Amino acid sequence: MLAPRNTETGVPMSQTEADLALRPSPALTSTGPTRLGPPPRRVRRFSGKAEPRPRSSRPSRRSSVDLGLLSSWSQPASLLPEPPDPPDSAGPTRSPPSSSKEPPEGTWMGAAPVKAVDSACPELTGSSGGPGSREPPRVPDAAARERRREQEEKEDTETQAVATSPDGRYLKFDIEIGRGSFKTVYRGLDTDTTVEVAWCELQTRKLSRAERQRFSEEVEMLKGLQHPNIVRFYDSWKSVLRGQVCIVLVTELMTSGTLKTYLRRFREMKPRVLQRWSRQILRGLHFLHSRVPPILHRDLKCDNVFITGPSGSVKIGDLGLATLKRASFAKSVIGTPEFMAPEMYEEKYDEAVDVYAFGMCMLEMATSEYPYSECQNAAQIYRKVTSGTKPNSFYKVKMPEVKEIIEGCIRTDKNERFTIQDLLAHAFFREERGVHVELAEEDDGEKPGLKLWLRMEDARRGGRPRDNQAIEFLFQLGRDAAEEVAQEMVALGLVCEADYQPVARAVRERVAAIQRKREKLRKARELEVLPPDSGPPPATVSLAPGPPSAFPPEPEEPEADQHQSFLFRHASYSSTTSDCETDGYLSSSGFLDASDPALQPPGGLPSSPAESHLCLPSGFALSIPRSGPGSDFSPGDSYASDAASGLSDMGEGGQMRKNPVKTLRRRPRSRLRVTSVSDQSDRVVECQLQTHNSKMVTFRFDLDGDSPEEIAAAMVYNEFILPSERDGFLSRIREIIQRVETLLKRDAGPPEAAEDALSPQEEPAALPALPGPPNAEPQRSISPEQRSWAAFSTSPSSPGTPLSPGAPFSPGTPPVFPCPIFPITSPSCYPCPFSQVSSNPYPQAPSSLLPLSSSASQVPLPSSSLPISAPLPFSPSYPQDPLSPTSLPVCPSPPSLPSTTAAPLLSLASAFSLAVMTVAQSLLSPSPGLLSQSPPAPPGPLPSLPLSLASCDQESLSAQTAETENEASRNPAQPLLGDARLAPISEEGKPQLVGRFQVTSSKEPAEPPLQPASPTLSRSLKLPSPPLTSESSDTEDSAAGGPETREALAESDRAAEGLGVAVDDEKDEGKEPLLGGSSPILSHPSPVWMNYSYSSLCLSSEESESSGEDEEFWAELQNLRQKHLSEVEALQTLQKKEIEDLYSRLGKQPPPGIVAPAAMLSCRQRRLSKGSFPTSRRNSLQRSDLPGPGIMRRNSLSGSSTGSQEQRASKGVTFAGDIGRM
């Protein structure tokens, strides 16, 4: 008791003071002595803030398992005796969690004694808590490291390739991304492109060997497909997986899911997305169906349509798997019942099954509901599908357009469903290009002219079309092309250059839709009119006398383009307007197949006595149209050829009618023709085969190295011909080889051999359709080589009696001039006229044909209206030298010749074959004559039919070789054929503004005045050439050769220069004009039928020595021929449907496009591809700069025969009717 009071001693006092200093603090903060623990804790907490705070917070983030371990470790540690460490040293640095975590810490310890010890001995707790807080962090770190190691091992396993393709390019990873009933899809990698791919393993254990082989072939075929809306196939091979053979497919990896997953996620698809994705699915299906042979998906559904994430487009997948699925589920419902068309259950289906499935896909996309979800099993679905009951979800479709499309796709009858083309042309799937084309008036289905409106969207009006600012224009079916119309609009400034493609595409789609609609209506009307049991009429009518064919033809029903009654066809369709093909019946030389039943009257029927046939030069094949009542086309009208297309002209007159009884068509058969023959290095023949399924196949074979059996076997193997057609194909190939070899020998043989080979007994006829029945009636036939070589092997009709003066031609029965003999002697020949009204018998003379070369080719040329003089009798002084037979022997008309003939067709034999024609020099002699013409007079009832044959002006070519070559196109031999009704100048009407589009209307030709006969026949003949018509036309010398003609010539040259034309200047001003002074220039142009000069036809002995120059001509001719054939083949492929359409209408009122084809050249130019012509040619699209009918383009074989390389290289036009210039 005294110690505390002793204040002098510092030690006891300091201890007491220390105790006193420590006691009041708990008294202030605590209510009892049992709370002695918190003060030291507070001190440790104070010291703990400085250093170990982050460490003390770690246990609060551990799991309950780790915390339990901590509690179990801390209990024994707390009961151990703690060394007497000062609280200042150990306690502050190793403190457990702060007091804020005290209640959880109590739960960690979980024992009352621990709490007592903790409260009574805080130093022990602090010291024991130190080791406890050090050990637990090491245990969770080890577990985390273990988990991290396992994750890395798993990733290494997944990223390690488990399989490799046989070539080592593709790797397979053990990452499964999809699984189906018969396939498993893994992630793969293309090591060449480092692009991820899909590795698909298909189970084929249930397939037989044949089915497995078939599936492998299908997969090989699918590997070549590449389309933006088709999942790409990269590779495939067979593999063994777990002892089972499987097929591995490597395809494009689609990581954004399918349409099915999209519908599950978003439930409702927006109309714009539905439109875009449906259009892309249609494009993919169209690509598949347009392959040869067509590829059917057979299992199209939303599960098989994949989404490409980055581009937002869709692609069709799982191609070719329907074969596998059908075998895998042979005893159950095959495919997906909800998307299967009714005919799928019968396994007799075509492309229509994919259209049905597409309709169901659209239904699911529009409603987000699975089709036939109300059915409980596949049997109920089958009953509904076969009975035509639509799914309940069909009536939930809100958009009428979508509902109409779905209804048209899921019809029970596959013939009533939409086609892919119909769907792509539907307004719902039409792309918004800012261009709209619509009909300005209701379509009656008959008129060839469509009045259309073109509306352009205005961006300033929110994309709506400009009101009352539509461009109205007239589109002539069969004559106009969408590209030409669009390019004219660009040239006229109506649309900008950037809108050329959208406008052309919009016009083309609208016109195609109208034509499809018309075709459906026409077929419906025919089915109503025709009885179903009408059989094809017999078509095996023999031709007139001649050697029988090597094999008889099979009776074949006349096609739509066979109902004609003329011998030679002329194709005067615009080469860019139609997508048809004429190879089946119209060869490149323009000859009609003689097997055409419409051209073969019964054998017992005699021909009309008025139909006399004359023999014309071998380079010609022409006929005169009958001028019946109501016939308003003339030879000039019918002979408007597209010079650049290389096609002959087709002049079907309005008077032609086909028997409406027969329009049913039989299955098409294969047709074969020769397109070219080459004997330069190897003797190679190029043929074109139209297969039974209307496909065009071009193949070549070596005459020396390939046998007909090998060719036929290859054709059968590739399914180009049917096995039943093999024998007929063999016969035709053998005949082709025989005839080609004969022709090649003729080319190399003497003139006598050529003369005998091309005897008048041979008449062009057609090869029959293969195969032919053995008992069919024999017919005359011509091989495909004869058709392709027809330009230089055209044979005249059989000889007959000469024309008597008392047998004039009546207007109703004009004569037909198949192939006459043409005399050639001197360098400059001019035609001599022949009139059907003759006072003297025409002298009969032996006929001979020109020896012609294999490289020669026909050159059809354009023409305009024909100026015809009155009947001109022959002069008695006409030379009758048997060695120079300029006479025209008249041949009796065989029964095969029609009563109604077509317009003249002329084939140019060879524009460049100079040396070859010299062999005929010794056989021919000059036959000069002069024809003086009378003034015009009104037309009389008697038709004038002068045939002008060439007579020669004695002039040397040695000093004027270049001049004569440049004048080649101005000095052709022009046989002029007339009729009682002739066409005047085909002037174009003044341009009118139809809406905003400048349209020029063409008028019907009227009758021109005929010129009376002249009783005299002079020594020298010069036919008049046409003056300038419209802006540019042919030129000619005037009667006196005065300044008027020179001025007209200069104007013509200037007009030609505006079109990019190179026209030679007049070089023979000093020459005396050959036309009589009293002969006026005719008021309408003469047709340009031929385009070669006498530098190539009338030869001298000097030219035969220039072999080097001839070789250049042959090379140039061969190049032009190849170009011509390629153009013709392309055009024929494009024109098939249109020509069939036009022919099928011949039984009804024919459209004006057929009646007056001469307007085709004067109305619109061919399409000029963008960037392929200079600016001057682009500007020539203006109406004021169009070339006249007498102008020809020289970008095809029908160009000028001049020797100038510059003019050959240019793609301009040249005047072809300057006959009066030498």
Curated annotation (Swiss-Prot):
Its EC number is 2.7.11.1. Residues 554-564 are annotated as: Interaction with KLHL3. ATP binds at S181, T251, E252, L253, M254, K301. Residues 135-152, 1044-1056 have a biased composition (Basic and acidic residues). Residues 533-553, 935-944 have a biased composition (Pro residues). One of its GO terms (biological process) is intracellular chloride ion homeostasis. This is Serine/threonine-protein kinase WNK4. It comes from Mus musculus. The gene is Wnk4.
